Amino acid sequence: MADTMFDFMEMIDSDIMGKVLSQVREYDDTRFHASDVKNALGKDRLTFDDYSALLSPAAEDFLEETAARAKMETRKYFGSSISMFTPLYLANYCSNHCVYCGFNCNNNIRRGKLSYAEMESEMDAISKTGLREILILTGESRSQSNVDYIGEAVKLAKKYFSTIGIEIYPLNADEYAYLHRCGADFVSVYQETYDPDIYEKNHLSGPKRVYPYRFNAQERAVTGGMRGVGFGSLLGLGDFRKDAFATGIHAYYLQRKYPHIEI
């Protein structure tokens, strides 16, 4: 695992990464059968084994039943409402060399970033469509899209939107706290893959290469005061079942530790 920290990176004392990686190493989807899937679908509360069974090849014959159960759970907790948001890219500069990404720092593409006036013009136009939630994104470049720049963007967004999410490079807790004071509510970070070896092969250089720092980003965001955090994997880099399993239990462990947060 590539774990040489950059000087600016904050280390936190957390056992969540160890727990997740331990569970993933033990994951074996071949040990589940149709009876395990049926049993999981009939439960009110799932164990890790139940979750694994629903992700296993044995569950492929139960897609309709799984979709129906998922719909029921969604309606139970969220009703029939749908929350809509729009993404707004502020910049596409990046400091990382990720082999699968067109934004990577070695690609010869046109780069740019919005001025504050351009941001506000975009936000004004978006808000006039009736949307009240926005997701602010950048490429992962601290030099071209620094925290102050993003903070000013969040302040502008606060004039037009009731909910503001950010999907940028991972930050330290104090930087997340600053963006929260500016008006940000939610943070999304994609781990891409939870397999450390595959992660290292796909992230050749840049801060993103440091697996632990990225993994702990959501926890730093929570300690920085963010109301909610999002998780994700780029399915296909590694074993998609393992990565889906890891994404779910990463969120589970964080919510167990911080029960007040939204996932």
For each feature predicted by the language model, list its residue ranges:
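Short Fe-S-cluster ligation motifs
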Residues: 121-141
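Short, small-residue-enriched loops and turns at beta-alpha junctions
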Residues: 91-92, 140-145, 236-240
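Conserved C-terminal portion of the radical SAM core fold
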Residues: 138, 212-263
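Glycine-rich, proline-tolerant flexible connector loops at the mouths of alpha/beta enzymes
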Residues: 55, 86-88, 135-146
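Canonical Radical SAM [4Fe-4S] cluster-binding loop centered on the CxxxCxxC motif
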Residues: 76-118
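Flexible, acidic/Gly-rich N-terminal and inter-domain linker regions that tether
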Residues: 1-88, 96
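Short amphipathic alpha-helices and their capping/turn segments at secondary-structure boundaries
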Residues: 124, 173-183, 245-257
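Radical SAM/AdoMet-radical enzyme domain recognition
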Residues: 98, 132-134, 146-234
